[in-house]
Amino acid sequence: VSSKVVSKALGLREASPASPEGARRHREQVVARATVRVVAERRTPRGTTRVVEAVAGPVMAAAGVDASNTGPDGGVLLLPEDPDAAAADLHARLVGLRPGTRVGVILTDTAGRAWRAGQVDLALGAHGLHVVDDLRGGTDVDGRPLAVTERALADELAAAADLVKGKLGGVAAALVRGLPEAVAPAGTTPGARSLVRTGPSDWFAVGHHEAVRAALGAPPGSVAAEEVGLAPVGPEPVEERGARAVRLAVLGHPGAGVTGSAGTGYAVHAPDPVTAGRVAARLEVALAGEDVGAAVHVAEHPGTGAPSQADRAPGSRPPLG
């Protein structure tokens, strides 16, 4: 069942202002409310796109807030805060209509995937079925033991159902037959939230740019991140990436400044040698995070008469990006 029709039934639609700018700001506010944490963010011609951990569970763009197929009055739709509970409620209603029926319910939503282009439907919520087919402990066709393989059965069913439902025909649900082994007694199996990697199992809890920026005081989704500036979704000239690294390096260090360019190298100026060295080190990290290989040195500190010994040559350390 499409989560969109469930969201409509639950009254999770919000009207948007008529003006494009007002609608954009309203959508950003709605996304923020539906967000647990920001994973990655990029600048686009239409504003800022954020990949977030949604209150609904998965990591997805814009917390799953959607402005398509919302009805003639427009607005945006939010995902149910507890999709597994919504699936359980729908399951109970279906069984109530047909007592004795063995059925599993999957709430589906469309999302992108790391490492892959395009979008697919996945299981947002589930009840009354095994969401995973755990093959660990078995053997492959050659008799070798399987130690890792767990089929995300609920996601596979969600994607298969989308081949029938499609995106443009207004079909909200599909009935999948022929998998009796996937169905389980109500309340005996984990829901779709169990498919979301969290904690130590989440190797990609934050984007690589965002990890560097967060370490230097500008975590994703923060005012500081906006002040430093966000990377765009497409290619960007090296000088713009370098300028953003400079803004990040001097963040929280009043009186410090940087001159130079990505092509000629950067000189750090500060009221005292300690601050200068600190900002220079921050700049090296920030430049690596932007994949800019440029020399960094501390300018001669007033009153010392001595040049800095903190020079770094271009390419002295591999880029992080």
Q: What name fits each language-model region?
A:
Residues 279-291:
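Short, non-transmembrane amphipathic alpha-helical segments
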Residues 273, 277-281, 315, 321:
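Alpha-helical oligomerization interfaces
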Residues 304-319:
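Cysteine-centric segments in proteins
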Residues 2-8, 21, 25-67, 71, ...:
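A structural signal for small-residue-enriched, beta-sheet-centric alpha/beta enzyme cores
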Residues 263-277:
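Short glycine/threonine-rich beta-strand-turn micro-motifs
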